[in-house]
Amino acid sequence: MKIGIDTMGGDNAPSSVIEGVAIYLTQNTQDNVVLFGNKSVIEKECVDRIKDLSRVEIVDCKEKIEFDDEPVKAIRQKKDSSIVVGLKYLKEKQIDAFVSAGSTGALMAGGLLIVGRIKGIDRPALTTKLPYKSGQYLLIDVGSNTDCRPINILQFAQMATVYASKVLGKNNPTVGLLNIGTEETKGNDLSKQSYEILKNAKNINFVGNVEARDLPFSPPDIVVCDGFVGNIVLKLTEGFGLLFFDILKDIAKLSLKAKIGGLLLKPYLKNLKGKYDYKEVGGAPLLGIDGIVIKCHGSSDGQAIFNGINQAKTFYENNVLELLKEEITAESEV
């Protein structure tokens, strides 16, 4: 497998990106990578980290898309940026997948304008796994579409259903619509109209509305919403995870008994922390693009980048893209 990686995207790039690539290549000895970015900088980062440079191709890119760039304008004007060149390689099938911790908007715009959509999908969407008390659920969309129509919500649910069943092994996964109440009549116009279209859809296991307070305890397998709401849920979940462990650290400092208790609980808390750490998830697949695109967190470190690349590999090995195309095409022709 050959995976393309944007070395210029993210708060800690390129150092953290190359660190993640080095870990990946060490553990996946049959795979190759194509690194997009400033060649001289990449070469310096690679020298001390990657032993077998024969498995590394570097594509020199003179431009970089910043997080505050207007996405569509940046894609059209910065033709020699790591995101644009990387997505062109994906479109031309010179790489099997593309991973980036760069601008979400630019990745979305570039995916649409350069790679193109799966037939039958109006808008691609980002999905990620979030923790709850006894497992994980899929949340879609987590930031690529701030304004949606009911048909978009339906397509998000359809794509997430394929992903959950084929990659996560969920049998007939349940789908819930994130709303301000469980009653069918609750919510704004988008929520009410989306409820109707989801309720009448034959290819998803819709179980009704789900409230945000239920997400940490008993969510359905898939929770669907627009990207504005989804991104808030994602970042609030991350924030509460960090807050919880900060509070525990403060409590452990209160007394000797508290410190001893903290030491006894440390192995269990370490496992719990992993559930709430975005680094362990790695990245969010951009479902609906006619290619494998993984968006990593903007503040990703090496471990998070490594997990994001691993996610691209899992997507590829499970043939998810072709399964999505088959499922969505079949539904659009009904």
Swiss-Prot record:
Reactions listed under catalytic activity: a fatty acyl-[ACP] + phosphate = an acyl phosphate + holo-[ACP]
GO biological process, one term: fatty acid biosynthetic process
Molecular function (Gene Ontology), one example: phosphate:acyl-[acyl carrier protein] acyltransferase activity
Keywords, sorted A to Z: Cytoplasm, Lipid biosynthesis, Lipid metabolism, Phospholipid biosynthesis, Phospholipid metabolism, Transferase
The UniProt record lists the keyword Lipid biosynthesis: yes
E.C. designation(s): 2.3.1.274
Gene3D superfamilies to which the protein is assigned, alphabetical: Isopropylmalate Dehydrogenase (3.40.718.10)
Entry's localization field: Cytoplasm
SUPFAM superfamilies xref list: Isocitrate/Isopropylmalate dehydrogenase-like (SSF53659)
Pathway stated in the Swiss-Prot or TrEMBL entry: Lipid metabolism; phospholipid metabolism
GO CC terms: cytoplasm
KW RNA-binding (keyword) present: no
Origin: domain of life: Bacteria
Record-annotated membrane-spanning stretches: none
Family (UniProt): Belongs to the PlsX family.
Subunit field text: Homodimer. Probably interacts with PlsY.
Function: Catalyzes the reversible formation of acyl-phosphate (acyl-PO(4)) from acyl-[acyl-carrier-protein] (acyl-ACP). This enzyme utilizes acyl-ACP as fatty acyl donor, but not acyl-CoA.
Protein known as: Phosphate acyltransferase
Organism field: Caldicellulosiruptor saccharolyticus (strain ATCC 43494 / DSM 8903 / Tp8T 6331)
Name of the encoding gene: plsX
